[in-house]
Amino acid sequence: MVEYEAPLRDYEFLFNEVFDVTPTMERLGYDFDEDFLSMLAEGWADHAKEVWLPINQIGDRVGLNFENGEITMPQEFKDAYNQAIEGGWLSTSTKPEHGGMGTPIFFQSVIWGEIATSTNMAMSVLPALTLGVYDVLNEHGDQTLIDYFSTHLAQGHWAGTMCLTEPHAGTDLGIISSKAIPQDDGTYRVTGTKIFITYGEHDMTENIVHLVLAKTPGSPEGTKGITMFLVPKYLPVDLESGDLAGASHDLMENHNGVTCAGSEEKMGIHASPTCVMNFDNSVGWRVGDLHTGMKLMFQMMNQERLATGIMGLGLAEIAYQNSLAWAKDRRQGRDLKGPKDPNETADNILVHPDVRRMLLESKVNNEGCRALAAWTGILLDQMHSDDPEEAEYASSLVALFTPIVKAHFTDVACETASTCMQVMGGAGYCTEYGVEQFYRDVRISKIWEGTNGVQALDLAGRKITQNMGKNLRHLMWPLTEFIEENRNIPEMSEFNKPLHQGVRGLQQLTLLMIAEGQANPHFLAAGATDYCRYFGNVLLAYMWAKIAKTASKKKGDPFYDAKIASARFFFKRIFPETVSLAAKIQSGHKSVMEFPTEMF
């Protein structure tokens, strides 16, 4: 039986104590306080545990059914999804005028996202994608589209997807062949095939709204010629009047030429459809200006990249909780220094140093990533500040953090899920205990929304030099300020000194990557993944130093003492990885690129 308890105490600690979020949210205009956050988080945690978690293994074992171009989801999934709609749990951060709660973005992106993924990753993807479509539409769509589609999307009655990839065009979207032909009434006729479309077809909602990248006649070559179009599965228009808001008949009678040609068989997330979608002269509406499709889609994609990082964290957390429960219950052997439970036939396996190491690595990485997720979530809200300086500062940090959250979180999550299987031995490999499903499900997170190698290239090749290096300078301000503030505090020395060394190392490696990368792009590309990992570790080091500083004010309380001990483990056993990462980056590209191709 899979166990799960949402880390509600950790959320309270991070948002209320480490980051003291209430004054920021009040300044941004939210009707918000600590009690409201706790009530909302507890309510969602209870719902997800009671409704979503029990059907997670059903989704894995039963999966979906694809027949005659239609996908039928497990009935349990449809029932659970509708319960979430009724409870308002799919519309927490959407606008009140569209039926949403209007909560701060950080609740939906961090707290909702982690709990949803822990309890049912396959289910969680659908509302995450729908929210992305809703946000892009409300920022860039014309008012007619916003007025008609937003409420349906915000409340979860209609679902959303993003359609980028084609059989011949994956990372290189500039060569897509999907076409959009303008019509006299202002609509477009969209034709093309898209692949790997998550939730492209299903029966969970009344309608599916696709954001499709396509090219219009005479468009420039490459990505500069791409435009975004909104293409619904069913046309919500009155066919006689052509009035978008005048639909008065059954949507099922008004199919829009959007069909599913296949559903991929996958390693994990079996109840999350991955579709081949055909658009055959389908009616669509342009979103944004002509030839701005890539810019608009990257807004949604960056949102989904952050969501994917949180998904990794969610699965790593539930994997850790279940392996910890197993370790406490499983008795094998004795402590090397003598029995801990002499009245039992054996000690539980938590006495063994290697088991403790594995569990501590899992716990500490999870909690460090959660702290960085919390900071990033708050920045997402600050991006919408009326203060231009605050908005610019937040935007630059979110741009910098996005590839790190996506890549570092999911790299670590896959390692954690594998480690948690190892803690459980043979039981971890068996389907009965659930952890092997978490590993299969989380593995896609390193591939989704741009592989982690692409994220590393984005960080090293673009984000650190973007805006004349402003992104990185904005990060260095709080880091160097924290280091200076704690330089002469003895109890912070064990955390502050290695953090300082890590930050200095990051600065030096960044200069090296820029200088050598300009001379030879192979240098930058060969070191990008290690640089991203190094950067991620430095950010987690900053989080753990802040956590230790906050917890030191309440020593003697087991919760806070555990935070300090966890910070100590991070700096002693995880952060030293940066030394080897730096050595690999500094070694350059020659051992990679000069290896003869014919010898592979």
Where are these regions (language model features)?
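C-terminal amphipathic alpha-helical interaction region
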Residues: 466, 482-600
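A glycine-rich, basic-preceded beta-loop-alpha segment at the flavin cofactor/substrate interface
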Residues: 196-198, 237-261, 266, 273-304, ...
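Internal maturation/activation junctions in enzymes
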Residues: 64, 77, 111, 126-130, ...
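Amphipathic, small/basic residue-rich leader segments at the start of a protein or domain
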Residues: 1-123, 148, 381, 590-600
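Glycine-rich cofactor-pocket loops
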Residues: 25, 29-32, 61-73, 293-307, ...
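A short core secondary-structure module
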Residues: 187, 191-252
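Alpha-helix capping/hinge segments and adjacent helical runs
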Residues: 2-5, 182, 189, 269, ...
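A structural-propensity feature for long, helix-poor, extended segments
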Residues: 132-133, 142-145, 149, 449-451, ...
